[in-house]
């Protein structure tokens, strides 16, 4: 669309505003309760209703947060029947706050929000299922405003989704991310079976020369062996007006995450190669782009 703007009696300028450019915002999953890192938004987990988070907040702590940053809440647990009362009470309380969105895995979250007519935006976050725009559009038409895109599809597929949906996209861009989740306490069962004792919060699995962090809390989670580093792809996502990218600070020290955040905020085509190398050095050269440039092929061994 062309708009004429009259500057004075003799000059007319023509502006093409057919495409509006938005800023791609940075969401951080923090590994501490102090929200003192300069990002656009935080994704916070709530005790007993979230999984795969480095740190968990109580509802009262959420209520007392004083920040100008956007706050997303993760209620991404696969809920049990005995979770539903707490879940409903929590959603009611969260609907009274200035929450940007609720990440959910269990469809029960959506059902409760619709049944109670709660005014709270939702984020479809069924990690390994958010792979195509047709399903994303289905949930968008059900009232789900955002989608956390799977880490298991290529950059071009993410961009294709963006071109074919009205859903606001949140794309994982850096950090360790969950690769496998089990309701069973696999580490605890292993220790019990062999009469071993280990009070470590985080353990590691060695497999074919790679090391995978494993956390056994309310569920057992195995994380990727390397950090996802998508800073190069981030520039392309910005060009495509993708609304958010997600950084997970799990096992990254505060000083390092600050350096990385600053690079994401100042990256350009001119410094991208330098920044990519710097992030690799910061993360001990243990980085990968995973499926961003690989076809999604699963092999059973």
Task: Put a short name on every predicted segment.
Residues 9-10, 40:
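Generic N-terminal initiation segments characterized by hydrophobic and/or small/turn-forming residues
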């Amino acid at each position: 669309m062309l708009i004429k703007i009259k500057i004075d009696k003799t000059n007319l300028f023509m502006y093409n505003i057919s495409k509006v450019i938005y800023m791609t915002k940075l969401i951080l999953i923090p590994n501490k309760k102090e929200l003192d890192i300069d990002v656009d938004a935080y994704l916070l987990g709530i005790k007993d209703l979230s999984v795969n988070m480095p740190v968990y907040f109580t509802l009262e702590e959420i209520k007392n947060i004083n920040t100008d940053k956007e706050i997303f809440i993760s209620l991404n647990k696969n809920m049990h029947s005995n979770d539903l009362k707490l879940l409903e009470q929590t959603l009611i309380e969260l609907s009274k706050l200035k929450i940007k969105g609720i990440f959910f895995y269990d469809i029960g979250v959506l059902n409760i929000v619709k049944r109670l007519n709660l005014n709270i935006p939702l984020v479809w976050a069924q990690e390994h299922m958010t792979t195509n725009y047709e399903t994303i559009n289905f949930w968008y038409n059900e009232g789900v405003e955002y989608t956390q895109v799977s880490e298991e599809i290529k950059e071009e597929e993410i961009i294709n989704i963006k071109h074919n949906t009205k859903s606001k996209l949140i794309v994982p861009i850096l950090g360790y991310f969950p690769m496998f989740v089990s309701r069973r306490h696999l580490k605890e069962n292993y220790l019990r079976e062999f009469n071993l004792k280990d009070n470590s919060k985080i353990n590691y699995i060695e497999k074919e020369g790679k090391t995978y962090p494993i956390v056994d809390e309310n569920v057992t989670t195995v994380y990727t062996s390397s950090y996802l580093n998508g800073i190069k792809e981030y520039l392309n996502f910005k060009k495509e007006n993708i609304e958010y990218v997600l950084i997970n600070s799990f096992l990254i020290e505060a000083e390092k995450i600050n350096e990385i955040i600053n690079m994401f905020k100042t990256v350009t085509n001119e410094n991208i190669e330098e920044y990519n190398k710097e992030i690799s050095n910061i993360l001990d050269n243990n980085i990968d782009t995973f499926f961003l440039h690989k076809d999604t092929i699963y092999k059973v061994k």
